[in-house]
């Protein structure tokens, strides 16, 4: 594997172990050229999924992009990284089990919202505000009312 620091083509695996949920192999690597250390994850990929964007563009599914968007919603929230990783793995498995090679981005958005609602209300509202394109405070109030979260917002 290529070193992300210096670009050297060969790196050494120093440690390998299964991830906590058993869905990946975590590897610690060392570059003999620059002595940089980094971690990689190896996962089974059942099929290539293409995402159909609202604009009509097609892009390959990117697990890391999914993880980043979820991490933004969960920023500064008291949720353990292991729970976040399990949630991401659950969403990816659900997408792969749909048996489709092409999925609309709205499918991912709805799965993320469903999982976040179970995990953390604040992250759920944060994600919804971007996903549903809230523009005014009334959009938040309407959403909170629809979701039965308005009482929590008032207390």
Curated annotation (Swiss-Prot):
Region (Disordered) location: 1-22
GO biological process, one term: negative regulation of DNA-templated transcription
Sequence ranges of Basic and acidic residues compositional bias: 7-22
UniProt cross-references to InterPro entries, sorted A to Z: ATP-cone_dom, NrdR-like_N, RNR_NrdR-like
One of the Pfam families matching this protein, by short name: Zn_ribbon_NrdR
Molecular function terms from GO: ATP binding; DNA binding; zinc ion binding
Limits of the ATP-cone domain: 49-139
UniProt keyword annotation of Transcription regulation present: yes
Co-factor requirement: Zn(2+)
Co-factor: note: Binds 1 zinc ion.
Mapped zinc finger ranges (unnamed): 3-34
Keywords: ATP-binding, DNA-binding, Metal-binding, Nucleotide-binding, Repressor, Transcription, Transcription regulation, Zinc, Zinc-finger
Domain of life: Bacteria
Role of this protein: Negatively regulates transcription of bacterial ribonucleotide reductase nrd genes and operons by binding to NrdR-boxes.
Similarity section: Belongs to the NrdR family.
NCBIfam families in the cross-refs: transcriptional regulator NrdR
Name this protein carries in UniProt: Transcriptional repressor NrdR
Organism: Phenylobacterium zucineum (strain HLK1)
């Amino acid at each position: 594997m290529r070193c992300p620091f210096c670009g050297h083509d060969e790196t050494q695996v120093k440690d390998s172990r299964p991830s906590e949920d058993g869905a990946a192999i975590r590897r610690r690597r060392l570059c003999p050229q620059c002595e940089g250390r980094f971690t990689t994850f190896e996962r089974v990929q059942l099929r290539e999924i293409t995402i159909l964007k609202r604009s009509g563009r097609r892009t390959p599914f990117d697990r890391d992009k999914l993880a980043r968007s979820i991490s933004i919603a969960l920023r500064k929230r008291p949720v353990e990284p292991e729970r976040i990783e399990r949630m991401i793995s659950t969403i990816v498995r659900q997408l792969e089990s749909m048996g489709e090679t092409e999925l609309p981005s709205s499918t991912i958005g709805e799965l993320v919202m469903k999982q976040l609602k179970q995990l953390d209300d604040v992250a759920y509202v944060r994600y919804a505000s971007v996903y549903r394109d809230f523009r005014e405070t009334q959009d938040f109030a309407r959403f909170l009312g629809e979701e039965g979260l308005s009482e929590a917002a008032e207390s």
